[in-house]
Amino acid sequence: MAELTIRPEEIRDALENFVQSYKPDAASREEVGTVTVAGDGIAKVEGLPSAMANELLKFEDGTLGLALNLEEREIGAVVLGEFSGIEEGQPVHRTGEVLSVAVGEGYLGRVVDPLGNPIDGLGEIETSGRRALELQAPTVMDRKSVHEPMETGYKAVDAMTPIGRGQRQLIIGDRQTGKTALAVDTIINQRDNWRTGDPKKQVRCIYVAIGQKGSTIASVRGALEEAGALEYTTIVAAPASDPAGFKYLAPYTGSAIGQQWMYEGKHVLIIFDDLSKQADAYRAVSLLLRRPPGREAYPGDVFYLHSRLLERCAKLSDDMGAGSMTGLPIVETKANDVSAFIPTNVISITDGQCFLESDLFNAGQRPALNVGISVSRVGGSAQHKAMRQVSGRLRVDLAQFRELEAFAAFGSDLDAASKSQLERGQRMVELLKQAQYQPMPTEDQVVSVWAGTTGKMDDVPVADIRRFEKELLEFLHRKYQGLMTSIKEGAKMSDDTLTAIADAIADFKKQFETSDGKLLGEDVPAAGK
């Protein structure tokens, strides 16, 4: 056997080759921390001195956590997912990434969790990139004033508190007053715009469900699917059974998905249902992380929680692509108290509010819109021109009717003018009622409101008002289609158009039969009665 000899030159050459081929970036330094406290959806971690605010941390079982509290010796993290497998002493790794969500057209028609993962069993989602959840809202110079209408399909809202694309309009009221129904109907009302295929008309919708029952979210999805509205809607679901961290993050996830479309020059409608539950979840997380409580035990930055979310809704300037994101945040009140902490915060952030009152709802007035304290601060300039023309006096007339109604309750004798105003008010209240999941096209709303405010329905019995309206609109679409199309196109109505509408209504009245068997304008019973 030959003797093994190693020459010094060979050792030197091998070392030189290794040193020359060494790449410093191939080596990595990883920080590993340790869980010191775990439970109730939060974890405290030691040993990660370089962690960033809002950085994702990875626990031993693969669950992610979000670094919220950066203290001198430890990090307070909220666990994003099931926390039962996280125990003291387990290692925690940094990911080097801040929280982000995948975005893209593939989200339309899907139900996802607050991390953007599909939960509807329809397979993976095709995405076009990722977007950070904590992004700066558009600056003042990036914005443009609101000037395009975002119709809800409700006469009461579109006539008296109009909403424009890029506006933030709060929907506020007690539980079970129709807040979600108003929001869902607004999504359904975008169906005709979507079917035009025109990107300038199409609206992509996002429904963020926070802290609701799973059955409620399923029923909303079913209603949208049945109405043909799911194809342009994304549902971000954080049901009541989810950890508080998911409920806190869900609105930001929906907003990030919507912002991507907005910056691509598209129009977006996002509904947060509801922000009261998000604030409750944030309060729970903050108290568990030992942050100092403030009013109603909410942390000091709860205003910033909602302001940085809602400021992302905007109408972008032409240079930025002219896209828009319209926000409809929902807030629940207790006993119609709009002066509580969260309601006043969100009212001060938004551009107006629709206040739905439980007394009106229980009296059969649906939508239960309280005209007195509902307002739209910027939507007037975006309102459909024909609607603005016919709805000018509607708010004042209804407010006067409510006062007169309260006065008449004392049984005082009223003069003829007051009686006439009271009777017309009763008809207008009846006219503004609408069934759920039946939004009305703009041209139908214009005719209906004009007929009511100008007294064209004064001779129709109150009990027949809704049937009269339904049959009148069917008659107009059948025999006066050109007239309805001209109203829809958005121009202010000329005197000739108004005369044509009045003639058409008079024409219809000749054949309308009231519930007591009379033809309008005649005192004799209809034939066969």
From Swiss-Prot:
Subunit: F-type ATPases have 2 components, CF(1) - the catalytic core - and CF(0) - the membrane proton channel. CF(1) has five subunits: alpha(3), beta(3), gamma(1), delta(1), epsilon(1). CF(0) has three main subunits: a(1), b(2) and c(9-12). The alpha and beta chains form an alternating ring which encloses part of the gamma chain. CF(1) is attached to CF(0) by a central stalk formed by the gamma and epsilon chains, while a peripheral stalk is formed by the delta and b chains.
CDD domains the UniProt entry points to: ATP-synt_F1_alpha_C (cd18113), ATP-synt_F1_alpha_N (cd18116), F1-ATPase_alpha_CD (cd01132)
Function: Produces ATP from ADP in the presence of a proton gradient across the membrane. The alpha chain is a regulatory subunit.
Compartment list: Cell membrane
Ranges in coiled-coil conformation: none
A GO MF label: proton-transporting ATP synthase activity, rotational mechanism
Reactions this protein catalyses: ATP + H2O + 4 H(+)(in) = ADP + phosphate + 5 H(+)(out)
Keywords: ATP synthesis, ATP-binding, Cell membrane, CF(1), Hydrogen ion transport, Ion transport, Membrane, Nucleotide-binding, Translocase, Transport
Family listed: Belongs to the ATPase alpha/beta chains family.
Broad class of where this protein is predominantly found: membrane
Positions with a binding annotation for ATP: 173-180
Enzyme class: translocase
A single GO cellular-component term on record: proton-transporting ATP synthase complex
EC number(s) per entry: 7.1.2.2
Site (Required for activity): 374
Species of origin: Streptomyces avermitilis (strain ATCC 31267 / DSM 46492 / JCM 5070 / NBRC 14893 / NCIMB 12804 / NRRL 8165 / MA-4680)
Bilayer topology annotation: Peripheral membrane protein
Protein's name in the database: ATP synthase subunit alpha
